[in-house]
Amino acid sequence: MKVIAINGSPRKKWNTATLLEHALKGAESAGAETKLVHLYDLDYKGCISCFACKLKGGKSFGKCAVNDDLAPLLEEIRTVDALILGSPIYFGDVTGEMRSFMERLFFQFPIYEPDAAVRQPKKVRTAWVYTMNVTEELARQMGYDRMFRDNAGLLERFFGSCESLMCYDTLQFDDYSKYAARRFDPVAKRKRHEEAFPEDCKRA
C-alpha cells in the first residue's frame, strides 16, 4: 500500500504538517509505504488552460502536459492507494499553492463528451486535513462548511471517496508577544494547543 500526503502549508513543522505526519505514521504502522510532499518546495503554476489533456490523439490525453516540478508528483499520484491533502485556511479557502495543485490534479481527468465517465487511474481513498485559526462556531458562521463539502466532492468525483479532518482554533505563533495579535488570548491558545491539538493528531 502506498500513501502520499500533500502539505499545502508554507510551514513544514507546524500544525498542518504535524497532522499529516501523524496520519502517515498511522499508515506506516499498518505497513504502508508513505511520502510527505511540501508544495512550497516545488516550482509550478496552476492550470494554464492549454487543453492538451483533452486533445484527441494527443500524447498527453488524460494527463497534464505541463512539464515542471509538479509533473512527477502528478504521475506518482496515479500509483497511490491513498492520498491526503492538507492545508491551512487563508481567507476562507485553502492556500494558493494548494489551489493551483488542485487545478492541475483534477482538470486532467474530465472530458467534454456526452455521458462520458470521468477518467481516473483507479479508485483511491482520499482525505482532507484542514487547520484554521478560527473556532468551529466561527467557521460555520463564515460559511466554511460549503468549502469543505465542495473540496470533498472533488476528491469523491475523481477518486471515489473522501474523509475530512478539521482542526480549529490553532496556535499561530510560539510567542504571541512578538506579533501584532492582541485580539487573541495567548494563554487560551496555548492551552488549546496542549489539550485539543494532540487529540486532533490522534484523529489524523
Functional labels for PLM-detected ranges:
Residues 1-110, 114, 183-204:
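N-terminal beta1-alpha1-beta2 submodule of the flavodoxin-like/Rossmannoid cofactor-binding fold
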Residues 8, 39, 129-131, 167:
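Cofactor-binding loop segments of dinucleotide-utilizing enzymes, especially the Rossmann-like FAD-
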Residues 15-27, 143-157, 179:
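Short, solvent-exposed amphipathic alpha-helices that sit
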Residues 47-50, 139-141, 174-179:
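Short aromatic-enriched loop/helix-cap "lid" or pocket-rim segments at secondary-structure transitions
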Residues 71-75, 129, 174-178:
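Membrane-targeting and insertion segments and their boundary/processing signals
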Residues 90-92, 134-135, 171:
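Short, catalytically relevant binding-site loops at active-site mouths
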Residues 96-97, 109-164:
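Short, glycine-/small-residue-rich phosphate/pyrophosphate-handling segment
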Residues 149-204:
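Glycine-rich phosphate/pyrophosphate-binding loop and the adjoining helix
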